Each structure stands twice: as C-alpha cells, then as structure tokens.
C-alpha cells in the first residue's frame, strides 16, 4: 500500500477533529466549530476503507474553513469508501471520483458561501443521489431563515439584520437600529460562530458601542431578543433533529441565563431539569403540544434538507420561538455517568436514522453504479 503523504495525513486528522466527544464539555463542542476560524484543510483525499466486502463509494463535500457537519460517527469506514473533497480548494472543472452517493457536509451558510457555491457546481455534474443539496443549505443563513420561516404558522422568528461595525460604533448606531425595528435589549452576533461564541446581549443604547467593539469582524448581525424566560426565571432551549423528513428530539437545556447551551446549563446538577428533559425525549408531542410539532414539521419541509436540526423555545401560547435551523447541528453522545442514561435512547435513534438514510440513499443504486 502506498504511503500517505504528510498533507494527506493532515487532511484525515482534521476530518476526525470535526467530531465532538462529550455533550457537556465546552471545549469539545467548541472544537468542532473553532476549526472554521483557526485552521485550513488544503488537500482532497480518500479516507481509508477497513471493510471486507466491496465498499459503497461516497463523496463527501467539505469547506476548507470549517462550518462542516461532523460525520465520522455517521459514516462507517467498514461500509463506505469516502473521498473527501474540499470544494473551495479544487478546480471548478474537477471530476468527481467514482461514487454512488454525494454527502454535502458543508452546513454553515453564513461562513461557507464560497464552498457552497463551488459545491453547487460539482453536484450539477452527478446523476447520483445528493444528501443535503448545497443549494438548499445556501438558503439557511440566519438572515434568510428569519425572513422565510416567519411565514410558517406558529413560528416566531427574530428580526435579523446585517450591519457594519462602523455603523454600530457611530453616534447614529442606536437610531439606525431603531429605524430597522430594534429595541433594547437586543443581540449582536459575529456570523459563522457557534456554541455561544461572539454572541452577546446589548441591554441599553449606552452599551452598544462597547459591545459592538468587543466582537470580531467588520460585519455583525443585529438580532431581536426573543425572550423565552418563564415566570420562575428559567429559559429552555429544545433541539430537534430533522432527518429524512422525520423529527427526532435530541435534548432540552434549561438555564437561568438567556443564552442557553447544554454545556453551560445546570442539567448535570439539577435532577428536576433532567426529569423534564427525559419527558421531552420520551414524548415530544405531549411536552411541546401538537401545534408546535406541526410547526416543526413545516420548518423541516421548508428547509428541504435531508439532515438538519432546529433549536427553539416555546412561547406561552405554544408558538415556536426559533433560535436556529440549519445543518450544523451536532449529535453528541451523552456521558457514561448513570444520571445521563435516559438520553442514550434518543441519541441512538437520531444517529441510527441518519445512518439508515445514508445507506438507503446509496444502496438504492449500489448494484447499478458498480
């Protein structure tokens, strides 16, 4: 077997680094998305195949700057021979290697536009099935979602407007926000970051300059604050995966902070929080209500993605308060401690559904493609 070059080994290492290892570890979840800012993948290579039967040949499309869906736990290297193509690093005229399926793993429309545009050109030249068509992913940026998903019955989206830091730092910053329909408190975010990084609340007009100056990038997102806080002072963030047209509840995080993330919440310390999450995972429709479930199904249909997820809260009237809906959602394994045992079934169902979808899409054409 030919010895792999150093650049090839580097590419494969980065491919595995996209997978976080613990749902309650901040560093693990952040590592999956830090790569979009801090490292570059420069080569396209084939991953090792470890199976004994003839493999299913799969092309995986990724971005050089990150924003990719973690897939190592979904693609069994004893089943798939995976060729990873970094779309924004190859020629637009490049030929795809022999394949039976294309998995577009580029998930973040806000930071991966060049890679997605290149991916659109690549998939136009294949007749094989494509999971997560890049043209559909391209429509899932935060600004675009805030506009199109507000038309879904029972869904409340946050007004989201891109603004330059220069405008926000100027004396006219508060007035500009007011003209766009914002009021305080409101949120500012640097595009392309996840896990709560560079995402802050601006409580008053007097805080605007300091907060805007603290964020990286010259283009920021001004976002309406959707208050999901209940009378007891807690806020909830539900995550539901949308896989092959079906909904899979994944987790519920409860926190006294407005910015709710699983790894910063008190889920590990609060047995009553975990009991509420267990009820959500066991019977999503009863916890959310049929109105919210219908709204989630409509969101899934509107997104048009094979693999995606949605983070949201609930209003007092049962409306979905949409925080995020796209393909970048991570399915993380729960810890092995006994108090996380109730989470394993839901996680297994979501991962199993994704794996079954991938094999189904490829298997339908396996014999024909060989």
Regions found by a protein language model. Name each.
Residues 301-305, 314-370:
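C-terminal active-site "lid" helix and adjoining low-complexity regulatory extension at the edge
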Residues 3-5, 37-38:
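Canonical positions in the second alpha-helix
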Residues 157-160, 184-210:
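Glycine-rich phosphate-binding loop of ATP-grasp-fold ATP-dependent ligases
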Residues 199-295, 299:
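Phosphate-binding site of ATP-dependent enzymes
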Residues 47-54, 62-169, 176:
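Conserved N-proximal alpha/beta basic substrate-recognition cap immediately N-terminal to
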Residues 9, 42-43:
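Short coil turns that delineate tetratricopeptide repeat
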């Amino acid at each position: 077997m030919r010895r792999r070059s150093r650049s090839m080994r580097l590419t494969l290492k980065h491919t595995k680094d996209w997978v976080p290892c613990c749902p309650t570890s901040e560093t693990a979840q952040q590592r999956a998305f830090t790569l979009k800012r801090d490292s570059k993948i420069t080569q396209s290579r084939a991953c090792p195949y470890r199976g004994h039967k003839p493999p299913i040949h799969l092309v995986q499309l990724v971005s050089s700057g990150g924003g990719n869906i973690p897939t190592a736990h979904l693609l069994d290297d004893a089943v798939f021979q995976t060729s990873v193509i970094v779309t924004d690093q190859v020629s637009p005229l490049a030929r795809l290697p022999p394949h039976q399926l294309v998995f577009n793993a580029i998930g973040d429309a806000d930071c991966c536009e060049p890679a997605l545009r290149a991916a659109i050109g690549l998939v136009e030249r294949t007749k094989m099935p494509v999971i997560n068509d890049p043209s559909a992913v391209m429509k899932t940026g935060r600004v675009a979602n805030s506009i199109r998903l507000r038309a879904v019955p029972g869904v409340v989206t946050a007004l989201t407007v891109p603004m330059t830091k220069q405008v926000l730092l100027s004396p006219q910053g508060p007035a500009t926000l007011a003209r766009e329909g914002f009021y305080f408190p409101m949120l500012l975010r640097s595009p392309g970051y996840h896990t709560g990084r560079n995402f802050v609340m601006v409580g008053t007009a007097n805080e605007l300059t300091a907060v805007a100056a603290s964020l990286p990038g010259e283009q920021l997102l001004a976002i309406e604050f959707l208050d999901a806080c209940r009378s007891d002072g807690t806020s909830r963030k539900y995550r539901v995966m949308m896989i092959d047209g079906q909904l899979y509840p994944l987790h519920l995080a409860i926190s006294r902070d407005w910015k709710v993330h699983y790894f910063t919440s008190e889920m590990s310390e609060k047995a009553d929080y975990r009991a509420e999450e267990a009820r959500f995972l066991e019977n999503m429709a009863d916890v959310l209500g049929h109105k919210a479930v219908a709204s989630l199904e409509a969101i899934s249909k509107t997104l048009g993605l094979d693999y995606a997820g949605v983070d949201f809260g609930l209003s007092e009237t049962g409306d979905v308060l949409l925080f995020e809906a796209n393909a970048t959602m991570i399915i993380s394994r729960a810890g092995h401690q006994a108090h996380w045992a109730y989470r394993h079934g839901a996680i297994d169902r979501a991962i199993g559904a994704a794996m079954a979808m991938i094999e189904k899409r490829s298997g339908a054409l396996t014999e024909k493609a060989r």
